[in-house]
């Protein structure tokens, strides 16, 4: 039985090694995974012989697809075997993959970089001693023409479009940041090198590179936020919000959410109302964009008790603004024979033709955005009422504290009634229902006032 198992291992190993150098990337990937799993099941002798065999193939086989397959196998073996069992082989693995990462052929260095990222994630803290050499290698790679999107020889330039190196380099930087953790604050040289590389990649025109660079920044902010220029970051993320490239837009939203979660008050000083309006504007353009509502809601929850009036002003502006696309749609809707549109006329019930034309300069925003603004008004009333901040509901008490009443919730009751009543008579059912909810909130606030 033992002999049969051994023969099975040898046969499988031989087949996998033959497929490993195949020109088909799917077969190479499957073969490398199979070798990695075999190494995790077999003993130390198999693991050692497999590593030696891969090194020999890399040295003797100059075929780029074969070298790429061997790089994949190194990554698969280390990730499947684990850091403890494969620890003695980490130095050999890293040296081989770093050497292949500098190979000018796009196929070789792309898969070698991928394998290296996989090894770093699997090794975790055990990789600490290789951080400096890895960052130095990444800096050299960034300066090499062969690793650019259209760099190197003509043949390689045509291939590199399918195997972009820079996004994977960013993934490696991200993995290195995770390995360093809070220790990244101790080495100024390492910290500076990481920040400089990430900054350069964030300026690239390619969408994939920028997205990965943003992820690196997010990880860096977790461990050393005091070494990052937050105002410049906010301006950069804000610029990406209007990008036509959805992944870049979503990455910026996630990064802004992280900053808001960390310190919403500071974000209010940096971004101000305009940044929140920009986020609302994204809902106008595409209500399905993930994360926007989460950012705004988190921001509101953390800051509304300090200045509810400012948030009410913001919601008021959102509910009365327009977009260029709506102006075109509403102009078409005013033509004879056209039916009404929920998107453009959510709060336009009861308006005459003349009234609609007179208010064309202040047309309403899309109804889903209006609905979310109403939900924000509901959150404002609820959060302030539950905060225990008596001054927001008691004018005499606020005056006794010497507080200006203009920023308090109680001073905005008339505006809340107006917005809630207008919404409760809207054309769209969802807005009518939310308007009634806000109206109920206002009644509760007014009831508290009468009991003071």
Tell where the protein language model's regions lie, with residue ranges.
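Extended, low-complexity, acidic/polar intrinsically disordered regions
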Residues: 1-452
């Amino acid at each position: 039985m033992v002999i049969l198992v051994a023969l099975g291992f040898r046969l499988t190993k031989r087949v996998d090694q033959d497929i490993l150098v195949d020109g088909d990337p799917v077969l190479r990937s499957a073969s490398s995974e199979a070798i990695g799993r075999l190494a995790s099941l077999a003993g130390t002798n198999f693991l050692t012989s497999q590593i030696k065999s891969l090194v020999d193939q890399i040295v003797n086989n100059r075929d780029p697809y074969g070298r790429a397959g061997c790089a994949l196998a190194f990554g698969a073996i280390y990730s499947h075997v684990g850091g403890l069992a494969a620890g003695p082989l980490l130095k050999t693995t890293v040296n081989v993959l770093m050497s292949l990462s500098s190979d000018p052929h796009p196929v070789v260095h792309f898969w070698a970089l991928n394998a290296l990222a996989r090894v770093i994630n699997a090794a975790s803290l055990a990789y600490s001693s290789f951080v400096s050499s890895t960052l130095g290698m990444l800096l050299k790679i960034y300066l090499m023409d062969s690793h650019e999107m259209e760099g190197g020889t003509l043949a390689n330039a045509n291939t590199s479009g399918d195997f972009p190196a820079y996004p994977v380099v960013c993934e490696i930087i991200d993995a290195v940041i995770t390995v360093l953790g809070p220790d990244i604050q101790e080495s100024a040289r390492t910290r500076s090198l990481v920040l400089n590389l990430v900054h350069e990649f964030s300026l690239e025109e390619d969408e994939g590179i920028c997205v990965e660079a943003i992820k690196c920044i997010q990880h860096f902010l977790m461990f050393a936020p005091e070494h990052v220029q937050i105002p410049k970051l906010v301006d950069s993320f804000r610029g990406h919000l209007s990008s036509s490239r959805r992944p870049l837009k979503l990455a910026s939203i996630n990064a802004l959410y992280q900053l808001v979660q960390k310190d919403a008050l500071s974000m209010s000083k940096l971004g101000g109302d305009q940044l929140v309006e920009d986020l609302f504007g994204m809902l106008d353009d595409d209500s399905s964009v993930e994360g926007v509502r989460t950012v705004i809601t988190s921001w509101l929850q953390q800051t509304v008790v300090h200045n509810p009036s400012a948030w009410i002003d913001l919601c008021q502006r959102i509910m009365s603004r327009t977009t260029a696309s709506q102006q075109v749609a509403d102009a078409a809707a005013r033509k004879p024979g056209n039916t009404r549109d929920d998107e453009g006329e959510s709060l336009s019930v009861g308006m005459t033709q003349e009234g609609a034309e007179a208010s064309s300069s202040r047309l309403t925003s899309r109804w889903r955005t209006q609905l979310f603004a109403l939900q924000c008004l509901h959150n404002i009333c609820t959060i302030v009422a539950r905060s225990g901040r008596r001054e927001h509901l008691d004018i005499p008490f606020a005056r006794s504290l010497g507080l200006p009443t203009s920023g308090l919730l109680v001073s905005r009751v008339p505006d809340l009634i107006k917005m809630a009543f207008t919404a409760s008579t809207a054309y769209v059912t969802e807005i009518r229902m939310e308007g009634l909810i806000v109206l109920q909130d206002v009644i509760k606030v007014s009831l508290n006032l009468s009991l003071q």
